[in-house]
Each structure stands twice: as C-alpha cells, then as structure tokens.
From Swiss-Prot:
An example Gene Ontology molecular-function term: 2-C-methyl-D-erythritol 4-phosphate cytidylyltransferase activity
Role noted for this protein: Catalyzes the formation of 4-diphosphocytidyl-2-C-methyl-D-erythritol from CTP and 2-C-methyl-D-erythritol 4-phosphate (MEP).
Gene from which this protein is expressed: ispD
Protein name in UniProt: 2-C-methyl-D-erythritol 4-phosphate cytidylyltransferase
Record's catalysed reaction(s): 2-C-methyl-D-erythritol 4-phosphate + CTP + H(+) = 4-CDP-2-C-methyl-D-erythritol + diphosphate
Listed PANTHER family: 2-C-METHYL-D-ERYTHRITOL 4-PHOSPHATE CYTIDYLYLTRANSFERASE, CHLOROPLASTIC
GO biological process: isopentenyl diphosphate biosynthetic process, methylerythritol 4-phosphate pathway
Family: Belongs to the IspD/TarI cytidylyltransferase family. IspD subfamily.
Length: 231
C-alpha cells in the first residue's frame, strides 16, 4: 500500500476545551513563545513540503481560530468537529481525498519536528499498514488498585508511549474508525481503531520533546523545547 503517488493530508482535531489547564480559553489557544500552541503546531505542518493540505476540526463555538495568522493559509481547510476526538477526525476525513494518506496530529503538540514527519512518511516501506510515532517507556511503571495503592509493577519491555502524528491511508482509517465507533469500541487514538479492525500499525521512534501540553507546567517545558528547535 504505497503512498508515493498520493498526496499527504494533515488532520488536526482542535475542537476540545482542555479543561485540565484551568484556563479561560481552550488550551490550544494559550500563548507560547509569541504565538499560540495551535499556531506552532500549524506552522510545522503547513511548512512541510510533502503535506498538501491541513484540515483542522474546530468546535462550532470557536471564536479564536479566525484570529490566528495561519487561518487564511492556502493549504488550510476547517471543518466542524465533534464532542470526541474520533468524531472530529471523522469529520476531517469526510473532506479528505480517499486515496490520500493522512497524518493525524494533536493540536496541543507544538514541538513536532519535520525530521519526525519525514521518518513517519518513510516508514510505509516497512509498515505499509500505517504507523504512529512513539517513545519507549523509560521509567518503572506501576499499576494501582482502586484506593491508590500499588498492585504490581508492569514490565516495560516493548512498552511505548503513543505519540502523534499517526499515519494511515485515509479510506482505511475512515472505514475502521466509523466501524469501531458503531460497535461501541473504546477509541482513544487512530491506532486503536485500526487495532480493533485487526490492523496492527507500526511504531516509529520519535523525539522525546514532542510533548503534549496538558497541564500548566507543560507550557514552560514546551517553550524551552521550541527555543531549542529554533522556533
């Protein structure tokens, strides 16, 4: 399933409100190094030479996106997202060429590098079924009981943190994501929908600084990483 002759489209589900940040605006619009988190994310995707289009799924009540300098970019298209990430991704897939390949990337991962995108795109020679960026688990992992006590230590061999982008053939992802949701499957990312359908995606080792801004402390870290990337 080669993508060499088909265009590559980036999908950014950005309809969430990011309540864990405790901010007055959705977290993707928080200021970060003289622009917004989402602005940094979009710059990376829009400026990549192999990405033909970027589709952003927005909350229907969104009043912030139109103020971004990236909002009028010729490669950018917006759609109305849904209540859950999977709903937003499906809405974006409805507008994507079914023959394309899609890179689905979290709005709140502003430190993505072009090098990681290149590695993921190139991975189809090894993983024609699609792949995701990941980072090997480095710390000792513990599972707890219902009261917070440690119940056991989890073996971290071959254990990975799932990152984004996640890279799949558009039609296959749309079919499997829709079927998984209809079956009531728990879909936490695109790879989980593919796994549910019996497709086992590959994992490509990505940079550790490709963090997701989830808590207030993450902003400081993301700022440092972006400066190191020259952004």
């Amino acid at each position: 399933m080669s993508q060499s002759t088909n265009q590559i489209i980036a999908i950014v589900p950005a309809a969430g409100i990011g309540s864990r940040m405790g901010a007055e605006v959705p977290k993707q619009y928080l200021a970060l190094n003289e622009q917004t988190i989402l602005g940094h994310t979009l710059d990376c995707l829009l400026n990549h030479p192999q990405i033909a289009q970027v589709i952003v799924a927005l909350n229907p009540e969104d009043k912030h996106f139109c103020l971004l300098p990236q909002a009028q970019h010729k490669k950018l298209l917006t759609v109305t997202g849904g209540n859950e990430r999977a709903d937003s991704v499906l809405a974006a897939l409805q507008q994507a060429d079914e023959n394309s390949w899609v890179l689905v990337h979290d709005a709140a991962r502003p430190c993505l590098s072009h090098l990681d995108i290149d590695k993921l795109i190139a991975s189809t020679s090894t993983f024609p079924q699609g792949a995701i960026l990941g980072a090997p688990v480095r710390d000792t992992m513990k599972r707890t009981g219902e009261h917070g006590e440690i119940s056991n230590t989890v073996c971290r061999d071959r254990l990975w943190h799932a990152l984004t982008p996640q890279y799949f053939q558009a039609k296959q992802l749309k079919v499997n994501l829709r079927a998984a949701l209809a079956a009531g499957a728990k879909v936490t990312d695109e790879a989980s929908a593919m796994e549910w359908a019996g497709v086992m995606p590959g994992i490509v080792s990505g940079r550790a600084d490709n963090i997701k801004v989830t808590h207030p402390d993450d902003l400081q870290l993301a700022s440092l990483f972006l400066k190191n990337l020259g952004r």
